[in-house]
A protein has these predicted regions:
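Fe(II)/2-oxoglutarate
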Residues: 1-81
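Generic structural signal for short, flexible, solvent-exposed coil/loop and linker residues
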Residues: 15, 59-64, 81-87, 121-124, ...
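Short N-terminal secondary-structure initiator segments
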Residues: 21-42, 110-133
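Long, mid-chain structured domain cores
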Residues: 68, 75-79, 84-130
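Short capping/connector residues at structural and topological boundaries
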Residues: 70, 75-77, 137-140, 162
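Short acidic/polar capping segments at secondary-structure boundaries
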Residues: 100, 161-162
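Extended, Lys/Arg-enriched charged tracts that mediate electrostatic binding to polyanionic substrates
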Residues: 115, 122-160
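Conserved small/polar residues in nucleotide/adenosyl-binding loops
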Residues: 164-166
């Protein structure tokens, strides 16, 4: 065809490597709690306490913590299930529930960072390279240069990094 450019060489050869989006198009009324919830058993909760204890006795900067540094078989199972829901299910998962009230915020940030690596590599949350972002109402007014997560504005239901499969 005259006047056209052949880009067929850029096509993906193996269709099996293209992630499916089946099930990821939904409205809230179609979802059931079991479609997106992963419950933690008692052993998994104990593993969280073990992570907290170990990081207190051998402190490392949060960004250096990796799941391989801990014996967490039950948490690994739970997070693999959550990842499967994200990758092949409705596209998001809720872990029910991390014992936030049992530990200090800094301890749970370490746990959250460590367990997040079971889902995939942790990535920057802001353009400036911020890796861990605190969602808090700072009293600022929502507008240019002020993220909604720093205000009391109601945020539209969404998932971040929706292009993760590309």
């Amino acid at each position: 065809m005259e006047g056209s450019i052949d880009l067929s060489f850029e096509a993906i050869d193996d269709i099996n490597n293209i992630p499916s989006t089946k099930g990821m198009g939904w409205v809230a009324s179609e979802l059931k709690r079991e479609n997106w919830t992963v419950s933690l058993n008692t052993s998994a909760i104990e593993e969280i306490a073990s992570i907290v204890k170990q990081t207190a006795s051998k402190p490392l900067p949060t960004l250096l913590l990796k799941p391989e540094q801990f014996e967490i078989p039950e948490l690994t199972i739970a997070y693999r299930k959550a990842k499967a829901i994200c990758d092949n299910g409705v596209g998001f998962a809720v872990i029910d529930k991390l014992p936030l009230d049992d530990f200090q915020i800094e301890e749970m940030v370490n746990v959250y960072w460590t367990l997040g690596n079971l889902m995939g590599p942790n990535v920057a949350q802001k353009w400036d390279g911020t890796m861990i972002y605190d969602v808090t109402d700072t009293g600022k007014k929502y507008g240019y240069g002020v993220r909604g997560s720093a205000t009391n504005v109601e945020l539209v239901f969404h998932t971040d990094l929706s292009l993760i499969h590309i």
